[in-house]
Amino acid sequence: MLIETRKLSKIYRVGVERIHALRSVDLNVGDNEMVAIMGSSGSGKSTLMNMIGCLDRPTSGTYLLDGHDVSRMGPAELAKVRNEQVGFVFQSFELLPRQDALQNVELPLIYSGSSKGWGSRRRRAREALARVGLSDRIRHRPNQLSGGQKQRVAIARAILNEPRILMADEPTGNLDSGTTTEILELFRQLHEEGQTVLIVTHEDEVAACCQRVIRLRDGEIASDKPVAEDIAGQSARGDQLSC
């Protein structure tokens, strides 16, 4: 199993108040799954993403990544896992405005202190941009790119180190419907090539493109179903979903 959590909990303290963001979450995700994590604001979906992506530590419980207990790792080990095992895609793209597409994609190799030379970094960044269909935009800066193109650059950056897990947090939130379809198709292509993909979303249309849908409520898993069963449940409530 690629991802395993056991009784994973996260409590934040705000003054004297204790906020239970996650409550004893048990979760398994296998290699090469494409999973949607859903829930309303405050449900715990972003907190769960932060735990899986090693951006935050649980208050209690265990998180195993490919059999390794991540919850017991120190800061240096966690940084290595984040850089090599997890790729992140965010709603706001998080691109450096003064750097072109190629330079933005190179960043994970630069920050990791990779021993690979300049030429090797450039080659890998070009290959990543080619995979997302942006070979003709490598010298464009973010302000010269459309929203969909910016997200493609962000995806290229996320897959540069060939991570085990690709995590996307509301990746279509700033995109129109046509561009959303294009980005979801790109995620499906990466999944078909063997990539494990986790998408945090509040949009049923995005979740419908995954294999499995996990819904959180009040920090707990309310449902965990194959997408066909989840869609059937949503349709029974009057929603029309398709991908």
Residue ranges and their predicted role:
Residues 2-216:
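ABC family nucleotide-binding domain
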Residues 220-243:
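Conserved beta-strand-loop-alpha-helix hinge in the C-terminal portion
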